[in-house]
Amino acid sequence: SLVCDLECSAEVTTCCETGTCHGITTYNCVGGTEPET
């Protein structure tokens, strides 16, 4: 799995559940992992 560094959105809900969404004007999901496909 790859480390997530993605914009927090509905498309990366799985990532955000296992990572940390943070930011002020830009929200990134950091510290989670990309779901295996």
Swiss-Prot record:
Localisation: Secreted
Keyword Disulfide bond assigned: yes
Disulfide pattern: C4-C16, C8-C21, C15-C29
Highest taxon of the lineage: Eukaryota
GO CC term (a single one): extracellular region
Keywords, sorted A to Z: Disulfide bond, Ion channel impairing toxin, Knottin, Neurotoxin, Secreted, Toxin
GO molecular function (one): toxin activity
Tissues where this protein is expressed: Expressed by the venom duct.
UniProt KW Secreted keyword: yes
Role summary: Acts as a neurotoxin by inhibiting an ion channel.
Domain notes: The cysteine framework is VI/VII (C-C-CC-C-C).
UniProt-recorded name of the protein: Turripeptide Lol6.2
